[in-house]
Regions:
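Non-catalytic propeptide/linker segments at domain boundaries
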Residues: 103-119
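Short alpha-helical segments enriched in small residues
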Residues: 1-105
Length: 119
């Protein structure tokens, strides 16, 4: 049973469900369509005190692959908008990569922040 909603596991679950749903919309004659499902969950900067690190987990599923990425932020030197922008850039990078575009948008992470890829 899932115990943390802000986790790689939850992002993967979301991506898999989104992929399954996208398949249900596909007409059988459209077999060259590049389907994907994407999931993103995060605990990012807020105006109230919150324990734990600022982080986000993104997963993307296709018929042949499942990739997941975890972003860890410097919560003392980031605000919500800057974290949201980085997450958005990584989501765009994921979608672009699925479609064969490998020219990633730079995330401009701080020295003590990281992007970790799994799967």
């Amino acid at each position: 049973k899932l115990t943390h909603h802000v986790s790689e596991e939850e992002a993967i679950n979301m991506a898999e469900k989104a992929y399954e749903k996208s398949e249900s919309f596909l007409d059988q004659s459209e077999n060259d369509t590049k389907l994907f499902g994407l999931g993103c969950t995060g605990a990012i900067s807020t105006n109230r005190d919150r324990k734990g690190e600022d982080r986000a987990h993104i997963a993307i599923k296709t018929s042949t692959s499942l990739d997941s990425f975890s972003l860890y932020f410097d919560k003392n030197n980031r605000d919500r908008i800057s974290e949201d922008i980085i997450i958005s850039k990584q989501i765009i990078n994921c979608i672009a990569n699925v479609h064969g575009i490998n020219n990633n948008i730079p995330l401009n992470l701080l020295e003590n922040e990281k992007l970790q890829r799994s799967h």
